């Protein structure tokens, strides 16, 4: 019995020492917990045993829903030749991480925390149309809410492929798609949804820089599933960026100069058709238009799969100028007939000076209907004229009597008759020359009348062709611009 009392006292003493040690450790722990910041304690609590290589769900059968959102900020470049669109967007991702949840009361009522992106699991959402790495700023943090919702906000410069249709340039509207999808996970693992409503996404232009060449019409969305293999389906969200080019600059620098040159070409028809200045004027105008096309060639978009309609317009305008020059050369050659040119045929005279002149309301064209002067008629007239003159001269005997009565030296009668005949032949030749000159002048006047009527006809046909072509293009461009 005396031996048991010391043992009991020793046991009590040891118990007191152990209790004091545990209390000291508890107080030290509480003091340390009170001095450590809540954010640091929360970060250590969340990332202590976190495995970022595992999809953050407690039930592996449950897919991770990733909600995405896109806000268009700027259209940086549209490369028609390489079919590349460069944009700048604000991209937002939302998903639930079941391993990043806590009770706010345990951590000084902290409801959200920013942690490094490299420390947690992030869905592998990529854009299928990527063709180059843009100069996007790096955002190394994400926001985590106490329910486990992760918010990943980052600006992106996207260099994506786009099928650009430049046929309607400069009144073209482009529709480029941005397809967001998981590169590895099927729809059973990662599903994609839209964070906002499609109407809100389509009409959101709150941060868009609207001072450039392109105008944002809207961003349309579409969700779909696609499968590479029959057993694997993938979720993807498409954003269709619809933009329209502002055509004012191109209308002023491309269309107006071409229109002015065509108007000057039409006004050039007011020059007289028998003037050689019209040909030189048309050639100068054609050379000026060629220089204009060389200058604007770098402004037009170039692709290997198509040509814009405005390029066809320039080619047709060049062809019209060439046709106008050819018509001018034809008319000038027609009204400048040479001396040996045949008279206007009767069928051409009737067709042009009667029918076409009446059709064009040019009034009645005077025509010279004169019978052709034949060599036989001229010969008869010459002989009769010579005969009459010879009858007045008389016979050689009369000439001899007259010479004797006057007592003056005269040439022999035969020589006098030959001189008179030579003089009459010279007069007849002069008369034939004058008649021939008048006939050639009349032929030239006839060809001038024909050329004038044909010039008016070709001018009106040319004017109708230019107006019809211009009205067609203006109508098409107006429909494309306001559709």
Curated annotation (Swiss-Prot):
The chain crosses the membrane at residues 247-273, 279-297, 308-326, 461-480. It is found in: Postsynaptic cell membrane; Cell membrane. One of its GO terms (cellular component) is cleavage furrow. Residues 1-23 form the signal peptide. Induction: By nerve growth factor in PC12 cells. Residues 24-246, 298-307, 481-483 are extracellular. One of its GO terms (biological process) is cellular response to growth factor stimulus. PROSITE patterns: NEUROTR_ION_CHANNEL. Residues 398-407 have a biased composition (Basic and acidic residues). The HA-stretch region of HTR3A seems to be responsible for the low conductance of HTR3A homomers compared to that of HTR3A/HTR3B heteromers. Forms serotonin (5-hydroxytryptamine/5-HT3)-activated cation-selective channel complexes, which when activated cause fast, depolarizing responses in neurons. This is 5-hydroxytryptamine receptor 3A. The gene is Htr3a.
């Amino acid at each position: 019995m005396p031996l048991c009392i010391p043992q009991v006292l020793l046991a009590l003493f040891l118990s007191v020492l152990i209790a004091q040690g545990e209390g000291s450790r508890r107080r030290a722990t509480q003091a340390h917990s009170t001095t450590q910041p809540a954010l640091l304690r929360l970060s250590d609590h969340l990332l202590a045993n976190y495995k970022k290589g595992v999809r953050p769900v407690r039930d592996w059968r449950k897919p991770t829903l990733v909600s995405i959102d896109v806000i268009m900020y700027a259209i940086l470049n549209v490369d028609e030749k390489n079919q590349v669109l460069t944009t700048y967007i604000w991209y937002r991702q939302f998903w639930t991480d079941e391993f990043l949840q806590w009770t706010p009361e345990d951590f000084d009522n902290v409801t959200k925390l920013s942690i490094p992106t490299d420390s947690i699991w992030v869905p592998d959402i990529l854009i299928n149309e990527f063709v180059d790495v843009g100069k996007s700023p790096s955002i190394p943090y994400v926001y985590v809410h106490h329910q486990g919702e992760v918010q990943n906000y980052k600006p992106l410069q996207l260099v994506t492929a786009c099928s650009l249709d430049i046929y309607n340039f400069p009144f073209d509207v482009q529709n480029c798609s941005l397809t967001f999808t998981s590169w590895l996970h099927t729809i059973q693992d990662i599903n994609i949804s839209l964070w906002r409503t499609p109407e809100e996404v389509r009409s959101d232009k709150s941060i868009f820089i609207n001072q450039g060449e392109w105008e944002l019409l809207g961003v349309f969305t579409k969700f779909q599933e696609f499968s590479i293999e029959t057993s694997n389906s993938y979720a993807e969200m498409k954003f269709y960026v619809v933009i329209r080019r502002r055509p004012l600059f191109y209308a002023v620098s491309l269309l107006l100069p071409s229109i002015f040159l065509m108007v000057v070409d039409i006004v050039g028809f007011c020059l007289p058709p028998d003037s050689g200045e019209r040909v030189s004027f048309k050639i100068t105008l054609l050379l000026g238009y060629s220089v204009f096309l060389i200058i604007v060639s770098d402004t037009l978009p170039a692709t290997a799969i198509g040509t814009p309609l405005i390029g066809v317009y320039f080619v047709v305008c060049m062809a019209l100028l060439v046709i106008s020059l050819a018509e001018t050369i034809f008319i000038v050659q027609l009204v400048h007939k040479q001396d040996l040119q045949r008279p206007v045929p009767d069928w051409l005279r009737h067709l042009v000076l009667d029918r076409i002149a009446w059709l064009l309301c040019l009034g009645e064209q005077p025509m010279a209907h004169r019978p052709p002067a034949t060599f036989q008629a001229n010969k008869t007239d010459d002989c009769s004229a010579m005969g009459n003159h010879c009858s007045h001269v008389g016979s050689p005997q009369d000439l001899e009597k007259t010479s004797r009565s006057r007592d003056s030296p005269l040439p022999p009668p035969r020589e006098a008759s030959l001189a008179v005949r030579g003089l009459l032949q010279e007069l007849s030749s002069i008369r034939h020359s004058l008649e021939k000159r008048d006939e050639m002048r009349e032929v030239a006047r006839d060809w001038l009348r024909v050329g004038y009527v044909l010039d008016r006809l070709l001018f009106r046909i040319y004017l109708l062709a230019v107006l019809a072509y211009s009205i067609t293009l203006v109508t098409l461009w107006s429909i494309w611009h306001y559709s």
